[in-house]
Amino acid sequence: MIELDINASDKSLSHRAVIFSLLAQKPCFVRNFLMGEDCLSSLEIAQNLGAKVENTAKNSFKITPPTAIKEPNKILNCNNSGTSMRLYSGLLSAQKGLFVLSGDNSLNARPMKRIIEPLKAFGAKILGREDNHFAPLAILGSPLKACDYESPIASAQVKSAFILSALQAQGISAYKENELSRNHTEIMLKSLGADIQNQNGVLMISPLEKPLEAFDFTIANDPSSAFFFALACAITPKSRLLLKNVLLNPTRIEAFEVLKKMGASIEYAIQSKDLEIIGDIYIEHAPLKAISIDQNIASLIDEIPALSIAMLFAKGKSMVKNAKDLRSKESDRIKAVVSNLKALGIECEEFEDGFYIEGLEDISPLKQHLSQKKPPLIQSFNDHRIAMSFAILTLALPLEIDNLECANISFPQFKRLLNQFKKGSFNGN
């Protein structure tokens, strides 16, 4: 059994810890922060808004919030981070000042009307490019009034932006989504003194009566990052793996449950139940079978590219449906998955909200065929999850990835850990 502490702090929790600290009044401590490019964008924006950030240890910070959020004299650069842009939009909607949020070409092409509409329901003054569809976003902070909103999509980022505005609005606001999305925002904010109640699937959010409590958070390992190595184990014969200190929030382990249904042996060992459930995950290789995925999409949307690799090793036709939001990520992930697999000669096809993949009962003929020519070049589309998913496939097939460096957005240690996996040894530090 190989033990692996991937030392890849959870991306969702890292973002939220930084952003929520701005609603506190006293210094907050964030330990084991994810030093990926996305989370560093949130940290830099906090500094631009007046927070004092001090490095206290490796990957750990003391964040002293400003007495009042400062109006910046420059654009707030979210780079490639949709979480930064959407959550800061909610936070800043009620703050005094003018704020402009922008990002790289990829982020500025991603849909933003999904947060502009609910924020406008509060009376927020927010504008986006091309009739509010895209960033850059301009926000003129103003007083907000409570509202009720039913989201047409299940999105933790949309929900979080709404909650951050609701905490600063006059009156109690209500939020409903058609499917449960990640709930870290509700869990963290409630632990810090926010009044957020779930009434029959409807979130009731009361305005803050006082600043959030100061906190000292240690971030657990990211299940989305850990899943890449669960996939590696699942497709590598005779392999067994122990992933340590992983966040086991039920809204974050759906991909592991899907892999389990496909035939992989997966067990959880809970180590603590404090703010979030944290524990270890045991994975053992076993033959995989095809699967159809059309439910709980919001809980596994980020892992679907990796699951597509598992589907390649699963006998029969696997299907993904109701996942249209994959087209609005860092790349069109439906197109990215299918075009790369087709380039390898795999039978697959895309449709508007998903794709199908005809799995291979035996991958060795494909490996032999590819070994007789120059390794195919996988197109990452500069999307970290596409790059890492197909990098795992290099464990079984001779491939090259055009830009594996984009993994640094969410998982800076990925390339090194993958090389260690190939050698059969790990050191997550």
From Swiss-Prot:
Protein role: Catalyzes the transfer of the enolpyruvyl moiety of phosphoenolpyruvate (PEP) to the 5-hydroxyl of shikimate-3-phosphate (S3P) to produce enolpyruvyl shikimate-3-phosphate and inorganic phosphate.
What SUPFAM superfamilies does the database record attribute to this sequence?
Answer: EPT/RTPC-like (SSF55205)
Q: What's its catalytic activity? A: 3-phosphoshikimate + phosphoenolpyruvate = 5-O-(1-carboxyvinyl)-3-phosphoshikimate + phosphate
Residues binding 3-phosphoshikimate, per UniProt:
K11, S12, R16, S155, Q157, D302, K329
| Cell compartments where the protein resides | Cytoplasm
Q: What is this protein called?
A: 3-phosphoshikimate 1-carboxyvinyltransferase
Please tell me where this protein is predominantly located.
Answer: cytoplasm
Indicate the residues that form the catalytic site.
D302
The subunit structure is:
Monomer.
- What EC number(s) does its UniProt record assign? 2.5.1.19
Could you read off the lineage of the organism from its UniProt record?
A: Bacteria, Pseudomonadati, Campylobacterota, Epsilonproteobacteria, Campylobacterales
Class in the EC hierarchy, top level: transferase
| Species name | Helicobacter pylori (strain G27)
Q: In which pathway does it act?
A: Metabolic intermediate biosynthesis; chorismate biosynthesis; chorismate from D-erythrose 4-phosphate and phosphoenolpyruvate: step 6/7
